[in-house]
Amino acid sequence: MVSLKTGILGGTFDPIHTGHLILADEVKNRLGLDEVIFIPTGQPYYKADKTISPAEDRLNMVKLAISDKPYFRVMDIEIKRSGPTYTADTLNDLKTILPEKTELYFMLGWDNLEALPRWHKASEIIRLCRLVAAPRIGQVKPDVDELDDKLPGLQQSLILLSKPEVDISSSLVRERVENGQGVEHLVPAAVASYIKKHNLYCRK
């Protein structure tokens, strides 16, 4: 059986933006992935004290953003899970759901890579997947040797990219909408229309 190479891009996607799509495309092309699965979070444990948009809206925006990319798809497994969302649990679920020979490539930013040794079941994460870490503009390159000391085996699992450097964030999109500014250059047109139609991120 031929192995499938599947990229995993998780996030709150509140909202999904062009930077997410650029990252997914870059990693897919560079590593020769067969597909990329977008996984919106349910209630992420690291944002438990913050208000995020309803899961249905975040899921719908991802569906709209990737609708013209046959090699992108979305799964709602974290949204359906009750309680906090943990990456290790999601990777274990994917190992059960996806074909047996599937190789997982989990995408994250350099900032999240720095924090990885403190994540829930971090050792299990690096056992279940390859890590693909990409920068955002202005971020300092992680000290991989130091991270490997904190989490042995991380370096062997890691693919450290120097690009794409994306200077877009969901918080920027939300802020611009709240201030009545356009976001058509930051999110796909269908997502911009959805935000407007459903009055997301507007001042209450």
Swiss-Prot record:
It catalyses: nicotinate beta-D-ribonucleotide + ATP + H(+) = deamido-NAD(+) + diphosphate. GO terms for molecular function: ATP binding; nicotinate-nucleotide adenylyltransferase activity. It is an enzyme of class 2 (transferase). Keywords: ATP-binding, NAD, Nucleotide-binding, Nucleotidyltransferase, Pyridine nucleotide biosynthesis, Transferase. CDD domains: NMNAT (cd02165). GO terms for biological process: NAD biosynthetic process. Pathway: Cofactor biosynthesis; NAD(+) biosynthesis; deamido-NAD(+) from nicotinate D-ribonucleotide: step 1/1. The keyword ATP-binding applies. Its EC number is 2.7.7.18. InterPro entries: Cyt_trans-like, NadD/NMNAT, Rossmann-like_a/b/a_fold. The keyword Protein biosynthesis does not apply. Belongs to the NadD family. Catalyzes the reversible adenylation of nicotinate mononucleotide (NaMN) to nicotinic acid adenine dinucleotide (NaAD). This is Probable nicotinate-nucleotide adenylyltransferase. The lineage of its organism: Bacteria, Bacillati, Chloroflexota, Dehalococcoidia, Dehalococcoidales.
